[in-house]
Amino acid sequence: PLIKFLIPFLLLQHHSVNSQPPPSPISAYETVAFGFGFFDKDDPNVFLLGNASVSGGALRLTNTDQFGKPVPHSVGRALHITPIHLWNKNNGELADFSSGFSFVVNTKGSTLRGDGFAFFLAPANLNFPKNSSGGYLGLFNPETALDPSKNQIVAIEFDSFTNDWDPNSPNQSPHVGIDVDSIKSVATVPWPSELEPDNAVAHASLNYNSESKRLSVFVGYPDNRNATVSTIVDLRNVLPEWIRVGFSASTGDLVETHDILNWSFEAA
């Protein structure tokens, strides 16, 4: 199939920090494959930033209180420590990659929700912005969000709350979008999350084909509600040679949990 989902999970584990990611090593593997069947708080391969934590084997990107309720204006990020050689400046070769993960976005009973999470690709030494809660999803802020010249990032957003820059504004319409150097998505599709129960597990798969330059995303639920979106983007024009991948999420005045249950990634 076009969209590959890594079945064998390498039981890597995970380390919690609140600083920026480490610098890129002098050398790194040309082919990268990793997977998590669950998350373990004691392993150094995943860096946690901001409010991200591990709870019950899941990667919880935003904060909850002592009763397990999501809290407002929380921002959390998690990224894999391994630098990925996305493209080669000497010969122009570009990598293919695929990723799959399961997740739960839970409002804990509220009919209002916000704000969402994203899977992202970013420079290996990215400094994450401050003031990035709410609709900025932990990846942008008011100064950078709509100015591509100030960003170097590609993200797949699972956006629960419709902001001014989102499709169908001012009507509320959760959506999956592909972001290229801006919080305003270049391609979107409705995300049927509001039709699902609070604890519904969704499965997402994404694939990048280096020949066609097509980035494709699929998200589905066990009841066969699903969505798919894609766009053409030459990542050599957007991202540096070396990148890292991870997740970011935020709440604003409205809240929900953002939990990643498992994750696989392969690039070659």
Residue ranges, per PLM feature:
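Polar, low-complexity loop segments and adjacent catalytic/binding residues used for recognizing
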Residues: P1-A268
